[in-house]
């Protein structure tokens, strides 16, 4: 895969992730603002969802998909050389990443496409850890407790646990542990990205194969 193809793949995934996270963040605040991207498929939540339900779905999306954004960026940076700003896979028109304006553009893109989703995840996580999860027994919710409690040995795909107030199905202990692990992976890859960008800046620019000097002969 060429660097150009990798950048196209990365920017597509990064923008889609950013749009979803911003929309979910706004939904937890009951905001009417939403970013819309026309796609062959539609990701849409029920307008009647509670704040906690949006937070649960947002953390699921973040944990499952966001780690790919810094992962691909790390892969791009490891194949780059000559400039830390050029190692970041964002490109805006024909602005040279090594130039002064280019460095500002790359820095802003890093904050928006990498840092903002992480900050949104922190916001969603603060909502999730304060939730109550209840056992679903005979069309009733009983034995409500926090997300780290699991009094019944239920399977991860059944309807044993739901959020209080008849929210979505949520598997306590299992889901938060997986979310913490995958979020930690995302944070690690983000830190690794910064390191690889610095390393790229210290590597000499790859110039490719230089043509051999012509052989000259002199006749005396």
Curated annotation (Swiss-Prot):
Q: Which GO terms describe its cellular component?
A: plasma membrane
Q: State the compartments where it is located.
A: Cell membrane
Q: What is the membrane topology noted in the UniProt record heading this document?
A: Multi-pass membrane protein
Q: Which keywords are on file for this protein?
A: Cell membrane, Membrane, Plasmid, Transmembrane, Transmembrane helix
The yes or no answer to whether the keyword rRNA-binding is present is no
**Transmembrane residue ranges:** 9-29, 54-74, 105-125, 177-197
- Recorded protein name is Uncharacterized protein y4fD
Name the species this protein comes from.
Sinorhizobium fredii (strain NBRC 101917 / NGR234)
């Amino acid at each position: 895969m060429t660097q150009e193809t990798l950048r196209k793949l990365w920017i597509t995934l990064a923008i889609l992730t950013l749009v979803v996270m911003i929309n979910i963040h706004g939904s937890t605040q009951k905001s009417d603002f939403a970013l819309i991207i026309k796609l062959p498929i539609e990701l849409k939540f029920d307008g009647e969802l509670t704040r906690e339900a949006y937070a649960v779905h947002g953390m699921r999306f973040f944990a499952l998909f966001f780690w790919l954004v810094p992962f691909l960026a790390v892969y791009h940076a490891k194949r780059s050389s000559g400039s830390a700003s050029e190692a970041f896979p964002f490109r805006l028109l024909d602005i040279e990443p090594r130039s002064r304006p280019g460095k500002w553009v790359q820095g802003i893109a890093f904050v928006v496409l990498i840092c903002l989703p992480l900050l949104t995840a922190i916001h969603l996580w603060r909502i999730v850890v304060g939730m109550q999860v209840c056992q679903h027994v005979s069309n009733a919710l009983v034995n409500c407790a926090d997300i780290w409690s699991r009094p019944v040995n239920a399977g991860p795909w059944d309807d044993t646990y739901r959020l209080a107030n008849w929210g979505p199905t949520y598997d306590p202990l299992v889901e938060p542990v997986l979310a913490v692990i995958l979020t930690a992976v995302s944070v690690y890859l983000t830190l690794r990205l910064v390191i690889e960008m610095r390393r790229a800046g210290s590597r000499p620019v790859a110039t490719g194969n230089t043509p051999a000097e012509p052989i000259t002969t002199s006749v005396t």
